[in-house]
Amino acid sequence: MSSLKKILGLKGKGKKSKKLGIAPPPYEEDTSMEYAPSAPIDKSYFGVDEMDTHDPNQLRYEKFFFTVKMTVRSNRPFRTYSDVAAAVSHWDHMYIGMAGKRPFYKILAFLGSSNLKATPAVLADRGQPEYHAHCEGRAYLPHRMGKTPPMLNVPEHFRRPFNIGLYKGTVELTMTIYDDESLEAAPMIWDHFNSSKFSDFREKALMFGLIVEKKASGAWVLDSVSHFK
């Protein structure tokens, strides 16, 4: 997180302007801060009166519409779903996109990978193995990620190369996710997965940077997102 000085544009005292070579104007001079941010934040300060405090034990439910289109091209056919997951999970390497949607995009990438189907060789580009998936619908996600920002109907496209062991190729993803404010019931996002492709759901989710736990009811909950994936 940037320091408050950087956010406010404050610089060290006595530094000269790089453009003019003269002493900086008053607004560039260092000042003593009467308030040093620390937790908990005083709700009386501007802009924090409705700030959500993340309680890791609080279970929330997010309902949304989603679409995911995925194309994976590889130099050779994948043998197992683990090979597929290892390749596709690199889709958000050097991620540039909407930060608030990233955990949900990770889920959609995981979802898309479980529904990939091989394209007939005669139709594949240059005869190389290709896999495609297209999933859309409504769903809800039980999670402990804290309050999420509003999600608008804006598609985002990602294209990333992968080089995993014997496999080299590209992953292309187009994903859309936005808030569902209707009162209609929706299935859990996990119900859209093709679970026949893998046995250890928790392990495969972690490959995509998703840390999930199972409730007493047997339903999966997104606890957090791994910072190492």
From Swiss-Prot:
Residues 1-23 are annotated as: Disordered. One of its GO terms (biological process) is symbiont-mediated suppression of host transcription initiation from RNA polymerase II promoter. Keywords: Apoptosis, Eukaryotic host gene expression shutoff by virus, Host cytoplasm, Host gene expression shutoff by virus, Host membrane, Host mRNA suppression by virus, Host nucleus, Host-virus interaction, Inhibition of host mRNA nuclear export by virus, Membrane, Phosphoprotein, Viral budding, Viral budding via the host ESCRT complexes, Viral matrix protein, Viral release from host cell, Virion. VSV is used as an oncolytic agent for cancer therapy, because of his wide host range, rapid replication and mild pathogenicity in humans. VSV used are mutated at M51R in their matrix protein. These mutated viruses cannot successfully infect normal cells, being unable to counteract the antiviral state induced by interferon-alpha in normal cells. Cancer cells are impeded with responsiveness to interferon, and then can be successfully infected and lysed by the virus. InterPro entries: Vesiculo_matrix, VSV_matrix_sf. SUPFAM superfamilies: VSV matrix protein. A motif (dynamin binding) lies at residues 2-4. It comes from the Viruses. A motif (PTAP/PSAP motif) lies at residues 37-40. One of its GO terms (cellular component) is host cell nuclear membrane. It is a peripheral membrane protein. A motif (PPXY motif) lies at residues 24-27. GO terms for molecular function: structural constituent of virion. Its main location: virion. The keyword Phosphoprotein applies. It holds the Pfam family Vesiculo_matrix. Phosphorylated by host. It is found in: Virion; Host endomembrane system; Host nucleus membrane; Host nucleus. Residues 1-10 have a biased composition (Low complexity). Forms a double layer around the helical nucleocapsid, the inner matrix layer binding to the N helix and the outer matrix layer binding to the envelope glycoprotein. Plays a major role in assembly and budding of virion, by recruiting cellular partners of the ESCRT complexes that play a key role in releasing the budding particle from the host membrane. Condensates the ribonucleocapsid core during virus assembly. Late-budding domains (L domains) are short sequence motifs essential for viral particle budding. They recruit proteins of the host ESCRT machinery (Endosomal Sorting Complex Required for Transport) or ESCRT-associated proteins. M contains two overlapping L domains: a PPXY motif which interacts with the WW domain 3 of NEDD4 and a PTAP/PSAP motif, which interacts with the UEV domain of TSG101. Homomultimer. Interacts with viral nucleocapsid; this interaction contributes to the virion assembly. Interacts with the viral envelope glycoprotein; this interaction contributes to the virion assembly. Interacts with host RAE1-NUP98 complex. Interacts with host NEDD4 and TSG101. Interacts with host dynamin. Interacts with host NDUFAF4; the interaction inhibits viral propagation and is independent of interferon activation. Interacts with host GTF2H5; the interaction may inhibit host transcription. Belongs to the vesiculoviruses matrix protein family. This is Matrix protein. It comes from Vesicular stomatitis Indiana virus (strain 94GUB Central America). The gene is M.
